[in-house]
A protein has these predicted regions:
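A generic structural motif
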Residues: 6-7, 31-38, 165-175
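Phosphate/diphosphate-binding loops
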Residues: 11-77
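Generic long, charged, amphipathic alpha-helical segments
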Residues: 178-181
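Long hydrophobic segments that form regular secondary structure
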Residues: 77-175
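Catalytic-core regions built around general acid/base machinery
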Residues: 1, 19-27, 150-161
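Single conserved hydrophobic/aromatic residue that forms the stacking wall/gate
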Residues: 2-13
Length: 184
């Protein structure tokens, strides 16, 4: 019964999303729906605007949906930027989704399934190395779930090297905190 209820809510949200997409398209916005066979799970908004003789981009990245009802249930992070490298990456992601061409080379963003996993592990390892040199090193990460063995191994090693690690995991988390000799 709960599955039916949640499926029903999902259908309502899908219909609302379609309505919003159609309304945005009717006023000239380009709405990108994603790639068939690839789950698109991004909360990104990119505005490109002409300012004088130049085009300027403004981007919004979020861990949460743009939904008033669910916003009351979750704690999400939001990032608003006009940084040229970040907004260029966002533009590349949208172009990839719209054209289904090869994934773009990104400078600041990471895109699954193409390079997110590898680059996350590299970044965690870099923080661990900094901690082992006595530098102030910290990882703060928010995610829906933490079940990947490679990421967990990298986090454990970084913590053992002295990095301070704060994880905000909404769902399944297979990494137990404060295990003596492992994650203490």
């Amino acid at each position: 019964r709960d599955v039916e209820r949640s499926r029903g809510l999902g259908d309502v949200y899908k219909r609302q999303n379609i309505n919003w997409a159609e309304a945005l398209e009717s006023i000239g916005a380009q709405v990108v729906y994603g790639v068939v066979g690839l789950k698109t799970h991004a909360k990104m908004l990119l505005v490109t605007r002409r300012e004088g003789r130049q085009l300027r981009r403004y981007g919004h990245l979020s861990t949460g949906n743009y939904n008033v009802r669910t916003a009351k249930l979750y704690t999400d992070l939001s990032y608003l930027t006009a940084d040229e490298e970040t907004t260029a990456d966002m533009d590349g992601v949208f172009n990839h989704l719209a054209s289904q061409n090869r994934p773009p080379k990104l400078r600041k963003l990471m895109l699954a399934p193409f390079h997110l996993h590898r680059r996350m592990i590299e970044k965690i390892e870099r923080v661990g190395l900094a901690a082992s040199r006595g530098e102030d090193a910290r990882i703060v990460a928010k995610m829906n779930a933490l079940t990947d063995e490679g990421l967990m191994r990298a986090l454990i090693l970084a913590g053992q090297r002295g990095a301070r690690i704060d994880l905000i995991v909404r769902g399944a988390c297979m990494l137990a905190p404060q295990v003596p000799g492992v994650t203490d």
